[in-house]
């Protein structure tokens, strides 16, 4: 399985901040935003990842993340010249995917919760169909909403419904089998002129192959598309890290625990960050070897 992070767009809701920098490079407490979706793919056991961004921002991501080797992964980059919809990611990434199943995560979504990695790996092991992740919200009319049966098979999908059929919002995390590129090519532009991911999900639903995985109590799903939500996400990460003493979305730690990075690799990363709390945290990992997250 391969991963795609969609980190394009113009971030208009965050202007003037994003006039000079990609939204996905903004800080969420102690890390760039892009670290958080990257961590999701790594927790799922995915090592080959494509980052899709704008032509203007691609160089900045390459400077930050390189080829991914310092995190034990392989990174490639592609351009989305204009924000023409989430489904376009699979058309842009067709050569990269090369017929393999994939996971798409949006570059401005943050996920956190106990047992997240086993849940992700369980979904990644499925060989057919698609899986979306549902998160219960108080205001479902603001989201894409999924309705499902007792076997967690999707029954309906609605975009910002006036009368929602459930309180389960569809998050920015999707797993697909190898048919996704074929489906993406069939998607027609919506009324707003975009290739909608909901159209792909609807195709899987109509084929009886759309499963819903729930992120229940204890899970956090944060969108960082507004000024207030940026602060809220940073405060959340700060609170958890200070209270519990471990870091959220520490890519070197995930790679190390996955066996993709050895002790020397962690030491090299720590030495370049020696004057920061992040670097000290990496060194402490090697000394204490604390519990799994």
From Swiss-Prot:
It catalyses: dTTP + alpha-D-glucose 1-phosphate + H(+) = dTDP-alpha-D-glucose + diphosphate. It is an enzyme of class 2 (transferase). This is Glucose-1-phosphate thymidylyltransferase 2. Keywords: Exopolysaccharide synthesis, Magnesium, Metal-binding, Nucleotidyltransferase, Transferase. Its cofactor is Mg(2+). One of its GO terms (cellular component) is cytosol. Binds 1 Mg(2+) ion per subunit. Homotetramer; arranged as a dimer of dimers. The lineage of its organism: Bacteria, Pseudomonadati, Pseudomonadota, Gammaproteobacteria, Enterobacterales.
